[in-house]
Amino acid sequence: MAATALSSQVRLPMSLRVATAPAPARVSVLPASNKLGDRLRMQATYNVKLITPDGEVELQVPDDVYILDQAEEEGIDLPYSCRAGSCSSCAGKVVSGEIDQSDQSFLDDDQVAAGWVLTCHAYPKSDVVIETHKEDDLI
């Protein structure tokens, strides 16, 4: 056999091919270990601006981390109680951007459509601006 076997005809296994998708704010490639070996997974990180009674604060939130959890990690004091998406203590109002709060069970469809959010069960899906400390306005 000649040494010409390696050429442009070599195909990568499906696990090594890169799929194209719309570019989020930031993308990180993180190793994820499992029993079958190491794999790579894409993780988007978004700019989240929180408008609190004490002023505005901005943070970077990965798309698989709840906004409340990341705020606490960065020392930002936000209200919460159940941390299960079943009360209104952490309620806020989305001013702009997209979030995924499909895990919560307190807000009804009309409230979600009106922009209400429970930060304890909200993932960013784009850059987002949220007014916090809004429980009294919701009830």
UniProtKB/Swiss-Prot annotation:
InterPro entries: 2Fe-2S_ferredoxin-like_sf, 2Fe-2S_ferredoxin-type, 2Fe2S_fd_BS, Beta-grasp_dom_sf, Fd_pln. CDD domains: fer2. It is found in: Plastid, Chloroplast. Gene3D superfamilies: 3.10.20.30. It comes from Oryza sativa subsp. indica. [2Fe-2S] cluster binds at C82, C87, C90, C120. Disulfide bonds: none annotated. Ferredoxins are iron-sulfur proteins that transfer electrons in a wide variety of metabolic reactions. This is Ferredoxin-1, chloroplastic. Its cofactor is [2Fe-2S] cluster. Residues 46-136 form the 2Fe-2S ferredoxin-type domain. PROSITE patterns: 2FE2S_FER_1, 2FE2S_FER_2. The keyword Nucleotidyltransferase does not apply. One of its GO terms (molecular function) is electron transfer activity. GO terms for cellular component: chloroplast stroma. One of its GO terms (biological process) is electron transport chain. Residues 1-43 form a transit peptide. Keywords: 2Fe-2S, Chloroplast, Electron transport, Iron, Iron-sulfur, Metal-binding, Plastid, Transit peptide, Transport. The keyword Transferase does not apply.
